Each structure stands twice: as C-alpha cells, then as structure tokens.
Amino acid sequence: EFILNGRVKVNGKVVTELGTKINPDKDIIEFDGKKVEKVEKHVYILLNKPIGYVTTVKDQFDRPTVLDLVKIKEKILPVGRLDMYTSGALMLTNDGDFINKITHPSHEVEKTYTVTVKGIVTQDDVEKLKNGREIPVDEKSEETFVTSPAKVKILKTDEEKNFSRLQITIHEGKNREVRKMCEAIGRKVLALHRRKIADLDVKNLEIGKWRYLTDNEVKRLLELDK
C-alpha cells in the first residue's frame, strides 16, 4: 500500500512497482521523505590474538591491528584491551552496550591468564599475588593502587631453565595489570597469554583465528552479574 501510494523512494526515485529489488547495503531508501536507517545486526566475535598486533581500530604508527585479522563488513570495536606483546582471548563487537557491560569494573568479569615468568615462584609469592599487590597506575604517574584479590596457581616450575608458569585470574583489567603484579613480586614476565574471558576459552581456537559467539554465549555473558 505504501509503495502504491508513492510514499517510498529508492535512491531519490519514487517506487510504484511491488517486488522492486533493493540492495540494503548500497541503496538509499526514503519513506515519506525521511531516510530509513538500516538497523545493523549485532555481531560478537572471539579472537585468539597473536603477539605483535595492537588492540585498536587504527594505529598512528601503522602497526598491525586486531582488525587486520577480522575482516568483516560490520564496524566492530575491541572489547577491552590486550597489549601488543600479550596473546589470547579478545572479543570484538558492534554492540556498545555489550562493550560497557563487559569492560565496566562493577561487573567483575573474570579474565584468566597463563603467565611465564623468570625464576622459581614460591608459595609465598603466590600468596602475595592472591592477596593483592600495590602497583603503579601507569608508567607516567607516581600514583599507585592495590589490586583486588586474585586466583593464582602454579602450573609448572623448571629449575634447570629457571622459569615458572602460573595461572592468574583477575577481574579488574587495569593497564598491564598482570605484568605489574608479577613485577611487584620481583618476577619478570617472559610470556603472557589470556586464556579465558569468563567461560570463553581459546584453547581450541588457533592463534590468529576467530569465531562468532553463539547466542547462548552472549546470553551468559550478559547475565554474569544478575
């Protein structure tokens, strides 16, 4: 009825023929003189980020970004950050509400890391990490804060090669927090990999690859603090 009454335009021309085909990605559609905005479908992606990619849409130094790995038509943004030298689980989406939900500290979404450090970690070191450590807010400030209690366990120690591997679970996600926590107990980080965000695990996702989240996975993430 709207078409027959001449109320619909495509690319500036009135459409009067029923069944007219359009390309929603290219054609401009108007109804009663007002442009009809396309409602973009929300997409949710889990990426196993490699080392060497920055977590940003565009980098001022032309370094590779995570969007170079996920080439889709939707305009997606990273959910949180992983520094250039950290690999592992990173979500991307075009749903702003979802980003706020996952990244806001009040929601306390857990992130689990596998950390390889120089030296042999003791049980005393583990307790210090569990109880929270005072670390700098950033490299440019003298301001510090005490990290929230973390879940920590030793996965491996190798006295011959002089390294330890830990699993650390936090929910704050401050800038380079896990690295700074390890530095606070005198341990240099040799490798850092984010294994999980909440219950999303990248163990079966090849490094550099990505997949869409299922509806159930998105639902579980949105219900985390309910």
Regions found by a protein language model. Give the residues of each.
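Basic, flexible Lys/Arg- and Gly-enriched helix-loop patches that mediate nucleic-acid binding at interfaces
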Residues: 1-226
